[in-house]
Amino acid sequence: MCIRDRTNTYELTNDMSHLEEKEIFLESTSSMVFDRVNRIVYAGISPRTNAVQLIIWCRHNNYELVLFETESHTGSPIYHTDVLMYVGTEIIGICFDVITKEHRDYVKEKVSTYHDVVELSPEQIEKFCGNAIEAKNKNDELYLILSSTAYKALNEEQIEKLLESYTNIIHSDIPTIEKYGGGSARCMLTELF
């Protein structure tokens, strides 16, 4: 099902689908990690995250852009920004080690301006620790949602720090999504709530 089929459910405000034919991509909430409170978009450049389209999108929507390059253990850029980081109301989880040295200090400064930081290791993001998402219940209590694979990869100190910002950490075992889909909890929820 393509985006045009969704227009009867969601209002299409900016159709960029024509760029697909030119293999220019900006894969929304996977390519762009949003700090909606402070109107900042964090994005790592990759074949799925076109820098020019990202700049245009941020200008059009009045978001500050924090653009950086990444390098995975294979030497390639990390395909989606939501693999290496998530943004919550009070806290950000991020793997600085996969951000190139030229951009690392800049990103560290930006993320720590408005948030506490939980640093993730490259091994932890391979276990989907960066692919988490914050949600709020009807009582305005904040929760962090991630997979059981990710939860088990967090250390005790990280869990304690997260529980200072969250009522609880919700996790579920989703190995099929992680193995065959290449994503985890955040990819499944995609901020459509």
Located regions from the model:
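The feature marks the mature, well-folded catalytic cores of soluble enzymes
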Residues: R4-F193
